[in-house]
Structures are given as C-alpha cells and as structure tokens.
C-alpha cells in the first residue's frame, strides 16, 4: 500500500503539474484538497481535473464562512495592513488552509503535505509554519524547491508534455490568487516596475476611470467592531462580503499597485484588488475615530502594524498574535454604530457617523462656551506643556548657543 500525500490543490498551473510529478518522483497516492475560500471556481471542474490528472481522491472544502467570520473580520477589527497598503488577502487565507490540510491528512492517514508555492515566495513559509503549528511530524514536499522546473514557462512546457490543461499561456502568464477578500496579480510584465499595470487584468474591479458616473452611498452598522448590517439589513458574513465586493467593484474601489518587502528578503511587485475590504476598513476606521480615546487609538496603530507583519509572515497561530487579539478585543467594546460612505470612481469618503458610545461631544468641541472647558484654561495648559522647551531655550542661551 502506497503512502499518501495531501496536496493543496487549486487547479492552476503549479498544482496541476505537481500531481503527475509527485506520482513519478515519489510513488505516492495523491489526495488533492481544494480549500474553498471564495475563489469562485467551478469546483466540480476542479474535482474532475484533479482526478483526470492522477489524484486518487479529491476534497472540496467550503470554509468561506469561517474565513470571513474568524479571519477577515479579525483583520478589520485590528485594521491590519502590510507596509501601509496591502490588505493581506493571500496572507489571511493561508493559515486556515494549512489547518484544514492537516485535518485532512489526519483523516486520511497521510504522511506528507505538498504545496505549489515557489521557493522565492512568502506562501511556502505561511503554509509550512501553519502545518507545523498543528502537526510538526507531517512531512512537507515543496516541488518548486526540488524539481528542475525553473520558470512558469518551463512549467507550461511540462504541462504540455503531460497533457495537462492549464489556464495560462506564455503570453498570459500572470500569477493570480483569488478569494472572497481579494485578487492578487504578480509576474509577467509587472516584474518591471516601470511598466504601468493593465486594467484588463482586473477580476473584481471596474477601472476607476470607467466606473459609473453616479455616486453610490452605503451604510454599514458595526457591533463591537464586527460588521452586522448593510443599508439596514442584517447579513451573514459571506453575503456581506459578496455584496460589498460587488458594490466596491462597480465603483472602482480598492486597487493597490505596490512593491513590497517579502519575508524571504527580496522585493516584489503586486497588484491587488480588495473592493469590499477597502470599504469595510474605511467604515471601521471612521467609527473608531469617534469611539476610541487618543492614547488607545495611537497605541493600536503600533499594534496594527505588528499584527500585520505577523500575518504577512505566516505567524497567525503564534502566541504574540493571540496576545494582540486580546488587546484588540478590548479596544472594540465600544466600536458600535453606523457609518455612511460615499463611493465614487475609486474613492471612499465618509458621509456621516452615528455612534452611541462616541467620545465626541459637539458642545465641547465647538468654538462656543462650555461648562467643561473654559477658553482661559488653555493658557495654563500651554505654559505647563511648553515648560521643557522653555527650560531648554534658557539653558542654551546661558551657554551662548
């Protein structure tokens, strides 16, 4: 009886050629596991392709609900970005996928997990750290670090030699990752940063200049940092994301073209579409500005940066990330209320916020008189606040500086 390997399978170029390669080079029974995080693929076609290519069994695992509820909404509450721009769509999906791969490996008695991540990318780290977090005894097979295939052109040639149908050509060679949160585009002419990316590559988004000429309004209601209602209607997490993606996509929202610092040390360029996520981030940030005090808000910005780095680096299941979650939860206890946004040709603008726990008081913040704040009080405050700088100036003057 052959040993088994569970392959993280998408039906794309890399994982399609890995099935025959594993059978040839390891003599293993290949179990293909497609973890559905909202790719919008024809899953029956994915299943049939895996079997046709040589898999002995195929798992199609729909984890969209868990992905949105436990991963994406956690990202919204923490307001995480990588290098101030990337909403971490790929990074957020990998820990859940790794967890499910381990569960399938245990159910099947498999000794190995295989993936199609390249030896230059971040995903190899994310998958393997995720697997090790649940079962460090499982073996890892990473073909891109082993085989003689050195480029996507080589991979296409190998696929053709094995009669494997793949969804790319040497002329259309972008590498894409899609889920319910985003689409990423890498490779091809994007590798030269002088090249403007082509809007024809977009999957989820209308180019801003071609978006509709009318303004769209949307109102989101949050409870303790979690989006619950859209335009007054309570929606389950997956439907919430699907609706926001459609609305954001129609209005050209959420396109990012950036050069980022990969975990493995090199820089890479990616184009990201995150229409619904960009809307959620804008609404949540507007609500936080009214409901979180200054010191906590400023400290949370530092926490958010570190949290984003942990997620990017594949450390979702780390003790530090668990500790940061505890901090974030406390900050969200009063982040409840409604945010109205205006969407227009790639722009998201706040059009009103209503929060029952708002720390903003119109009477105090206005230029008029207030029982809690007398304009004359500012004079004493300024004297105390500026005291260190007065002392510094006096000392420098005495020394002749």
From Swiss-Prot:
UniProt binding sites for L-citrulline: 86, 91, 122, 126, 175, 184, 260, 272
Annotated residues for binding of L-aspartate: 118, 122-123
Keywords, sorted A to Z: Amino-acid biosynthesis, Arginine biosynthesis, ATP-binding, Cytoplasm, Ligase, Nucleotide-binding
Record keyword Repeat present: no
UniProt-annotated location(s): Cytoplasm
Catalytically driven reaction(s): L-citrulline + L-aspartate + ATP = 2-(N(omega)-L-arginino)succinate + AMP + diphosphate + H(+)
Location, primary (coarse class): cytoplasm
GO terms under cellular component: cytoplasm
EC assignment: 6.3.4.5
Bilayer-crossing regions: none
Pathway participation: Amino-acid biosynthesis; L-arginine biosynthesis; L-arginine from L-ornithine and carbamoyl phosphate: step 2/3
GO terms, biological process: argininosuccinate metabolic process; L-arginine biosynthetic process; urea cycle
Pfam family, one: Arginosuc_synth
Binding locations of ATP: 8-16, 116
GO molecular function, one term: ATP binding
Gene3D superfamilies in the record: Argininosuccinate synthetase, chain A, domain 2, HUPs, Single helix bin
Family: Belongs to the argininosuccinate synthase family. Type 1 subfamily.
Subunit structure: Homotetramer.
Protein name per its UniProtKB record: Argininosuccinate synthase
Organism of provenance: Clostridium kluyveri (strain ATCC 8527 / DSM 555 / NBRC 12016 / NCIMB 10680 / K1)
Gene name for this UniProt entry: argG
